[in-house]
Each structure stands twice: as C-alpha cells, then as structure tokens.
C-alpha cells in the first residue's frame, strides 16, 4: 500500500535539494527568456494528480482501455475550452509538445519529400519550420524565407516569389524570435495563389491571441498549432487547432497524433491544460497580456535610448532581439554577464550574424515571466537600465554585484508565488 505521507525530501534528499535549488533560482532570478513563464498553483495542482496513473490511448468515447469515463470528461473540458478560447471548430489537446504538434501537422497534410516554405531559423523561425537539423528539413524539401534586413520585418514579396517558384504544398507562418505583427491574411493569399496549405505556428503569441491583442490566425490558416506554456502560461505541452470545418483534415490530424506519433496521452497534463484554458478565459488574463506588451515595448525603447540596437527598431509583441554587433559583445558573453547578476536571458542569432549559433551576436528578451510576477512599466524600465549598466562594461564586477543586489531586492518585492 502506498502511504500518503511518502515524500521526496525524506526518500531522495539529493533530488529534493536540486528541486529546492531550482525553486529558489526562480524566485531570486529575473526571467527574461521569451519562451518561459510561470504556471499558476492550480495548474501545478492538476499536473500533480493521480491522473498521471491512467492510460487512455485513443480519444474521448473511443478509447482502447477501460476505466476512461472520468479522464474523458477531463479531455472534453480541455477541448471545449480550447475551442472557445481561440474560436476553433477542432482542437487536439494530446500533443506532448509544440514540436510534436508540428510533426503531426506535417504527417497529416504532407508526404515525405513534399516541398514546404517556412521562416529561416537564422531570421526568427523555429527548428520545425524547415531547419536542416530537424525532421522538417530532413524528411521534406524545405525552402526558407526571411526578413527584410533593412526593416527587420517579414519580406512578403520574397515569400510570394519563393512560393511561386517552388510551389510548396504547405507554407508555414509563425516564429520563435520575431517582434512584429504577422499578416496572416497575406500569408493565406500567397498560399491560395499556389494551392498550398497555410499552417500557422503561434506558439509564442498564443496568449496574446487568446486575449485579443494580437491578430488571430484562425480565420486564415488551415491548421494552427501552439505550445500551452509561453505566453499562454499553462503546462508544457502542445495543441492543434483548426476552424476550416473540414472533417477529413480533422481525422487526419487526430490519426497523426495518435497512433501516428504518440501512444497514450498525458492525462495529468491535459487536466493542467484545461485549467490554463479556463484561466485564459478570465478577464484578468487580458489585463495581464496587455501589460506584457507594454513592458516589452518599454524595455525595447529604453535599450534604444541607452544606445543599443534593437532588431526592427522595437516590438509589437512580447519579445525583441538585442543586436550587440556594434558593441562587439557576443551573445554568449552577454548572457553570462547578465546571469552573474541573476538576470536570465538567452543568446540568440541576429540577422546577418557573423558568429556561430553557439556564440551569436544577440540576445532574445521577453516580458511574459516578469509581468506574471507583477512587474509594471516602471520596474521594466529600471531593469533595462540595470542590464545596460552591465552590458556597457561586462568586465566591471562591481557593477555586476551592485545590480545583483538590486535584483534580489526587486525579486523579494515581487515573489513568483506570494
């Protein structure tokens, strides 16, 4: 018999110490990685339930195992809330990750060797949008588009030219490091011109889309995917959506997830997704997302005022790229210097980056996590000044120590879990 008072601390102190250290790090460090966020205690509670014990291969009402009557309710709640949140007529909540959701779309709509047109990783796309190191570039004929190097915006003329030239079966819109507003309608216009599917990966902006402050791709795309963390602030996982009312495609998508790419769904994670979708339907979520954008804009503006280059000259969403080429600082060194002061970012390539992806010449900076813990525009601006103080001379250890003390004080004022 399993006793309810069994715990990690007593049984595995080494593991427990690592967990406690990570908890402390999250509280005492300022998180600026654009793809990270903090889930609510309700999401954590759902993810820690006995639902993790239940195998449920298949879909609600069509399971391969018995005893699924209760987890069917859980999954149906997640599906209905996802549809309501994004205005979809189809939702699959089973993908374990955004990349697995994307892989399912490829499997459902394409044959091996088909041509796809996606955003270059070097210009802000994602590995699964056709990178040569990903399944999307290895199993398919991937053609890549980029941004206008002058404006930092998507070059729609190039997208159309490449589409007409290569006749892709699927065009991928979406990004992992792009600070502008994407014209989903323009992408659909190009896709229709060449008879291609339009697949949108909105993983980074799903929360903004749900709140109605970033254009929704749902009226334009054949299929949409997203992660359920990032701006959506739910558990780590994936989601597939559509609003085209095409049952044939819906069946293909379901089959591509199970049995095509996965076995049993993670029912405890699906429960956590259901909680997160309900939270995203609350009015407070819209207020949060509005502040996310305000904070990101304030940070980008402050960097520019301090003499730093921001790709595209600012941001219209939750993230931006800091170009350090003119400062002769590598992204790797900048990442480390800020990390020493308890400010967590990630090094990132910038357009025309002369350095390798392991070194880079830029930083990707995002505001979802700091906003989640309560930072407003004032705190965001102050934080940016501290970051500039460090980047002005990354060898100045006195500045680093001073900023670290200020960061710790600010984190104490705005705990993640108060």
Curated annotation (Swiss-Prot):
<dbReference type="InterPro" id="IPR039429">
    <property type="entry name" value="SHMT-like_dom"/>
</dbReference>
<comment type="subunit">
    <text>Homodimer.</text>
</comment>
<feature type="binding site">
    <location>
        <begin position="356"/>
        <end position="358"/>
    </location>
    <ligand>
        <name>(6S)-5,6,7,8-tetrahydrofolate</name>
    </ligand>
</feature>
<dbReference type="InterPro" id="IPR015421">
    <property type="entry name" value="PyrdxlP-dep_Trfase_major"/>
</dbReference>
<feature type="binding site">
    <location>
        <position position="121"/>
    </location>
    <ligand>
        <name>(6S)-5,6,7,8-tetrahydrofolate</name>
    </ligand>
</feature>
<feature type="site" description="Plays an important role in substrate specificity">
    <location>
        <position position="229"/>
    </location>
</feature>
<keyword id="KW-0554">One-carbon metabolism</keyword>
<dbReference type="GO" id="GO:0019264">
    <property type="term" value="P:glycine biosynthetic process from serine"/>
</dbReference>
<dbReference type="InterPro" id="IPR049943">
    <property type="entry name" value="Ser_HO-MeTrfase-like"/>
</dbReference>
<dbReference type="InterPro" id="IPR019798">
    <property type="entry name" value="Ser_HO-MeTrfase_PLP_BS"/>
</dbReference>
<dbReference type="GO" id="GO:0030170">
    <property type="term" value="F:pyridoxal phosphate binding"/>
</dbReference>
<keyword id="KW-0663">Pyridoxal phosphate</keyword>
<dbReference type="GO" id="GO:0004372">
    <property type="term" value="F:glycine hydroxymethyltransferase activity"/>
</dbReference>
<dbReference type="GO" id="GO:0005829">
    <property type="term" value="C:cytosol"/>
</dbReference>
<keyword id="KW-0808">Transferase</keyword>
<dbReference type="InterPro" id="IPR015422">
    <property type="entry name" value="PyrdxlP-dep_Trfase_small"/>
</dbReference>
<comment type="pathway">
    <text>Amino-acid biosynthesis; glycine biosynthesis; glycine from L-serine: step 1/1.</text>
</comment>
<keyword id="KW-0028">Amino-acid biosynthesis</keyword>
<protein>
    <recommendedName>
        <fullName>Serine hydroxymethyltransferase</fullName>
        <ecNumber>2.1.2.1</ecNumber>
    </recommendedName>
</protein>
<dbReference type="Pfam" id="PF00464">
    <property type="entry name" value="SHMT"/>
</dbReference>
<dbReference type="GO" id="GO:0035999">
    <property type="term" value="P:tetrahydrofolate interconversion"/>
</dbReference>
<keyword id="KW-0963">Cytoplasm</keyword>
<comment type="function">
    <text>Catalyzes the reversible interconversion of serine and glycine with tetrahydrofolate (THF) serving as the one-carbon carrier. This reaction serves as the major source of one-carbon groups required for the biosynthesis of purines, thymidylate, methionine, and other important biomolecules. Also exhibits THF-independent aldolase activity toward beta-hydroxyamino acids, producing glycine and aldehydes, via a retro-aldol mechanism.</text>
</comment>
<feature type="binding site">
    <location>
        <begin position="125"/>
        <end position="127"/>
    </location>
    <ligand>
        <name>(6S)-5,6,7,8-tetrahydrofolate</name>
    </ligand>
</feature>
<comment type="similarity">
    <text>Belongs to the SHMT family.</text>
</comment>
<dbReference type="InterPro" id="IPR001085">
    <property type="entry name" value="Ser_HO-MeTrfase"/>
</dbReference>
<feature type="modified residue" description="N6-(pyridoxal phosphate)lysine">
    <location>
        <position position="230"/>
    </location>
</feature>
<comment type="pathway">
    <text>One-carbon metabolism; tetrahydrofolate interconversion.</text>
</comment>
<dbReference type="InterPro" id="IPR015424">
    <property type="entry name" value="PyrdxlP-dep_Trfase"/>
</dbReference>
């Amino acid at each position: 018999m399993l006793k309810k008072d069994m715990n990690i601390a007593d049984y595995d102190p080494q593991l427990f110490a690592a967990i406690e250290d990570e908890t402390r790090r999250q509280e005492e460090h300022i998180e600026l990685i654009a793809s990270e966020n903090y889930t609510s205690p309700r999401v954590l509670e759902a993810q820690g339930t006995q639902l993790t014990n239940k195998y449920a291969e298949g879909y609600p009402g069509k399971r391969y195992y018995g005893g699924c009557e209760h987890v069917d309710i859980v999954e149906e709640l997640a599906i209905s809330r996802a549809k309501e949140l994004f205005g979809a007529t189809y939702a699959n909540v089973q993908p374990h990750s955004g990349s697995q959701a994307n892989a399912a779309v490829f499997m459902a709509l394409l044959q091996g060797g088909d041509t796809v047109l996606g955003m270059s990783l070097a210009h802000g796309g994602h590995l699964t949008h056709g990178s040569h190191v990903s399944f999307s570039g290895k199993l398919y004929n991937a053609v890549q588009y980029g941004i206008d190097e002058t404006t930092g915006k998507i070059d729609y003329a190039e997208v159309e030219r490449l589409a007409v030239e290569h006749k892709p079966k699927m065009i991928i819109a979406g990004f992992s490091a792009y600070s502008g507003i994407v014209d989903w309608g323009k992408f659909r216009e190009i896709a229709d011109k060449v008879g291609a599917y339009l697949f949108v990966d909105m993983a980074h902006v799903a929360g903004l889309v749900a709140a109605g402050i970033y254009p929704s791709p749902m009226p334009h795309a054949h299929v949409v995917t997203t992660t359920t963390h990032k701006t959506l602030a739910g558990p780590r996982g994936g989601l597939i959506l559509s609003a085209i009312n095409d049952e044939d495609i819906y069946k293909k998508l379901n089959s591509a997830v199970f049995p095509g790419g996965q076995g049993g769904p993670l029912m405890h994670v699906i429960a956590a997704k259901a909680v997160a979708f309900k939270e995203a339907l609350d009015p407070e979520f819209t207020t949060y997302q509005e502040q996310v954008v305000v904070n990101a804009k304030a940070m980008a503006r402050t960097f520019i005022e301090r003499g730093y280059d921001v790709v595209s000259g600012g941001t219209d969403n939750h993230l931006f790229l800091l170009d350090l080429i003119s400062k002769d600082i590598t992204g790797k060194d900048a990442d480390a210097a800020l990390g020493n002061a308890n400010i967590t970012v990630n090094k990132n390539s910038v357009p025309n980056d002369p350095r390798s992806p392991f070194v880079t010449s830029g930083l990707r900076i995002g505001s979802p996590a700091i906003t989640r813990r309560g930072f407003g525009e004032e705190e965001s601006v102050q934080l940016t000044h501290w970051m500039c103080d460090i980047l002005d001379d990354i060898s100045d250890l006195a500045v680093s120590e001073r900023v670290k003390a200020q960061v710790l004080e600010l984190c104490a004022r705005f705990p993640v879990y108060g």
